[in-house]
């Protein structure tokens, strides 16, 4: 059930009531000021406002006294328990300013001198008489001369001594006199920047971030510094240290002032309200305006504030600018440099290996020269330093180990001097090599062995006599030089040694084009079957390119094929080249050159009795018919009254092979060939017919 209306209590907003009362007091004060005027001086009001607005600043000497007292407390010094002990002293600057009025005058700003001030000074000091500086200097100098001339020498010396004594006394009393002492030497006052720098160094020294040159004056604060810089300092003491040294109490004061300003702004919106209100209606309007503002804030408290205004935020360059990230690029460059170094190292190792292999080959070559007895073997050191060339390698091997090397035969029979005491009647079929001297102590025969010598005078250490067959005749023959050469000891062949060609192949195999993944990559060469396609070198050089292409296309010559396919093509083209008639049909330029050779020698075309049936020289030098195939070598004799039948057959066969032809430059070309070159064969054919008609009509017109 709802509660009765009488039991409900009325609650009053205390903060709003206090602000309203303060507002009413200001309003009443403003109304009285407007009516009776402001009786107080403006200076007092300004001083009060300044004193209220200005922030309380701590004296640096007071801060040092505070740190000194805190250090004594942390150290638990016995002086803190004394009753008469004082830890805070009044600063010299404040005491001097309060006691000495002259210090207050010096602190005031120096008033600039205007023209009126200068005129007033002249009237008061010089009785209104303006005197130039030059004249005044002259007057003072004349006055001094008059004084010196009136004084005697003793008086002058006495005056100088007194002035010197006064100067010495002033210099001795300078430290104690302070500002009232001699004006010759004055203590320089520190500037504001120097004082601020000293305070900053002092704070950094307490933080342990900097050292001070004269730490004697801060000897009492050493314990506080060590206490605050202890790494095991607890959290509370660390917070107190940071709060005092970083002056965070000033930040709190600024925050409080900002909060007060925000409250004042929130309390009153719009233009400032005049406090001077003469009528009560104005008070009601102001109250209603505040009420409306409060209702609007309460009703729209869940909406976005300041939705009607477009907010703009300044750009923070440090956070908005994109930082240049080149870590991946640097990583790639490092990887590239590392691979480059590894590649250079690998190349150096391969180069060293190649040099060692070259030395080994040169040693093998020197040994080969000694064995063969050929000092000019045909292979020099420069041949090994060049790049590998397969054709040059084959020529080099053919030059060194060709047929001349293996098939060399001595032209003259060698003559050997016969030596006495040697017999040449030996049966070399039963010769079993040179007899080696055995060590009888290592392998001694037993008396029961079948080969045991029963002779008592037998000495195993002596060389055994050579076995020989009895000569057929009773004469004693000498040993031939061949027998002496065969009987010499020969080096045993080592099957593990490589041939010289294998050494060269292994040396050239060390060359490479590039190194990929620590592996030297090189082109692989293979041995192909040599094939001339049934043509000689002269025919290949003298023939036209188109004729060579008709005989064998360039695509087929450069095709990569297996060895069986190359052998098959070699046999096919060798058989194709044996057909001389077909060869002449393809290589017409070669046949024409051979046919024109005798005509150029005599100056007249050579024709036989048959006329058109002239013989054309073949490619191999033999004379054959111009168009007859090789199968029709024997022809029947042709009667002089009838045209020979084989000539018609030859023309018909030629027409079937080439089709309708056109003569151009003394050569016959088929229409398909002219069309392949982009020419119009019909037009050329009609031009040829027109020329023939004009030639035929020429003799008729002349007759």
UniProtKB/Swiss-Prot annotation:
A GO CC term assigned to this protein in UniProt: 90S preribosome
PTM annotation (Phosphothreonine): residues: 91
Source organism of this protein record: Homo sapiens (Human)
Stretches with biased composition (Acidic residues): 251-266, 417-438
Sample GO molecular function, one term: RNA binding
Modified residues annotated as Phosphoserine in this record: 93-95, 97, 136, 141, 163, 171, 280-281, 309, 622, 628, 639
Basic and acidic residues bias locations: 27-42, 52-63, 155-168, 322-337
A biological process term (GO) from this entry: endonucleolytic cleavage in ITS1 to separate SSU-rRNA from 5.8S rRNA and LSU-rRNA from tricistronic rRNA transcript (SSU-rRNA, 5.8S rRNA, LSU-rRNA)
One Pfam short name: Kri1
Keyword Phosphoprotein attached: yes
Segments crossing the lipid bilayer: none
Protein name from the UniProt record: Protein KRI1 homolog
Keywords (A to Z) from UniProt: Phosphoprotein
The family this protein is said to belong to: Belongs to the KRI1 family.
Biased composition (Basic residues): 463-480, 640-656
Region: Disordered, residue numbers: 27-63, 83-111, 127-193, 249-284, 305-351, 412-490, 594-665
Classification of source organism: Eukaryota, Metazoa, Chordata, Craniata, Vertebrata
């Amino acid at each position: 059930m709802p509660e009765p209306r009488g039991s409900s209590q009325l609650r009053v907003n205390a903060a709003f009531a206090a602000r309203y009362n303060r507002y009413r007091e200001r309003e009443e004060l403003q109304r009285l000021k407007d009516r009776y005027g402001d009786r107080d001086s403006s200076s007092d009001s300004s001083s009060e406002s300044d004193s209220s607005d200005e922030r309380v600043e701590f004296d640096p000497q007071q801060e040092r006294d505070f740190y000194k007292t805190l250090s004594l407390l942390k150290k638990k010094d016995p002086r803190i328990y004394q009753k008469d002990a004082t830890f805070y002293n009044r600063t010299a600057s404040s005491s001097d300013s309060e006691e000495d009025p002259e210090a207050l005058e010096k602190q005031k700003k120096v008033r600039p001198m205007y023209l009126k001030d200068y005129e007033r000074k002249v009237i008061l000091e010089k009785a209104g008489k303006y005197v130039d500086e030059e004249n005044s200097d002259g007057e003072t100098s004349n006055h001094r001369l008059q004084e010196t001339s009136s004084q005697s020498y003793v008086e002058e010396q006495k005056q100088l001594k007194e002035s010197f004594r006064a100067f010495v006394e002033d210099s001795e009393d300078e430290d104690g006199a302070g500002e009232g002492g001699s004006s010759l030497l004055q203590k320089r006052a520190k500037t504001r920047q120097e004082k601020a720098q000293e305070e900053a160094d002092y704070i950094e020294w307490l933080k342990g971030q900097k050292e001070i040159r004269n730490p004697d004056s801060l000897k009492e604060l050493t314990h506080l510094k060590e206490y605050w810089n202890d790494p095991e300092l607890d959290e509370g003491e660390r917070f107190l240290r940071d709060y005092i040294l970083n002056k965070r109490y000033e930040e709190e004061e600024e925050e409080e002032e900002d909060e007060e300003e925000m409250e004042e702004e929130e309390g009153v919106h719009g233009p400032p309200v005049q406090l001077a209100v003469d009528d009560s209606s104005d008070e009601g309007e102001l109250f209603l305006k505040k009420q409306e503002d409060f209702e609007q804030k309460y009703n729209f408290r869940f909406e976005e504030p300041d939705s009607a205004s477009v907010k703009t935020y300044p750009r923070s360059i440090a956070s908005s600018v994109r930082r240049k990230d080149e870590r991946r690029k640097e990583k790639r460059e490092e990887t590239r440099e590392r691979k480059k170094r590894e590649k250079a190292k690998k190349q150096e190792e391969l180069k060293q290996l190649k040099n060692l292999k070259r030395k080994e080959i040169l040693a093998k070559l020197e040994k080969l020269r000694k064995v063969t007895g050929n000092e000019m073997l045909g292979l020099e050191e420069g041949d090994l330093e060049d790049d590998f060339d397969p054709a040059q390698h084959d020529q080099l091997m053919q030059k060194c180990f060709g047929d001349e090397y293996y098939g060399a035969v001595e032209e003259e029979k060698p003559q050997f001097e016969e030596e006495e005491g040697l017999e040449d009647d030996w049966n070399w079929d039963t010769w079993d090599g040179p007899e080696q001297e055995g060590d009888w102590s290592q392998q001694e025969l037993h008396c029961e062995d079948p080969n045991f010598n029963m002779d008592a005078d037998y000495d195993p250490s002596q060389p055994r006599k050579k076995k020989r067959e009895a000569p057929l005749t009773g004469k004693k023959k000498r040993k031939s030089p061949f027998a002496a050469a065969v009987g010499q000891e020969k080096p045993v062949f080592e099957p593990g040694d490589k041939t010289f060609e294998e050494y060269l192949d292994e040396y050239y195999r060390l060359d490479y084009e590039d190194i990929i993944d620590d592996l030297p990559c090189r082109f692989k060469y293979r041995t192909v079957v040599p094939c001339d396609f049934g043509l000689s070198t002269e025919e290949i050089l003298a023939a036209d390119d188109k004729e060579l292409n008709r005989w064998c296309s360039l695509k087929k010559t450069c095709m990569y094929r297996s060895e069986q396919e190359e052998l098959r093509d070699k046999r096919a083209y060798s058989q194709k080249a044996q057909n001389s008639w077909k060869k002449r049909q393809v290589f017409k330029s070669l046949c024409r050159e051979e046919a024109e050779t005798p005509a150029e020698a005599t100056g007249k075309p050579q024709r036989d009795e048959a006329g058109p049936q002239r013989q054309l020289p073949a490619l191999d030098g033999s004379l054959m018919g111009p168009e007859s195939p090789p199968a029709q070598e024997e022809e029947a004799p042709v009667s002089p009254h009838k045209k020979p039948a084989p000539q018609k057959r030859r023309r018909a066969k030629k027409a079937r092979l080439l089709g309708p032809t056109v003569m151009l430059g003394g050569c016959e070309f088929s229409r398909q060939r002219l069309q392949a070159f982009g020419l119009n064969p019909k037009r050329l054919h009609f031009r040829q017919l027109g020329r023939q008609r004009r030639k035929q009509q020429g003799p008729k017109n002349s007759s």
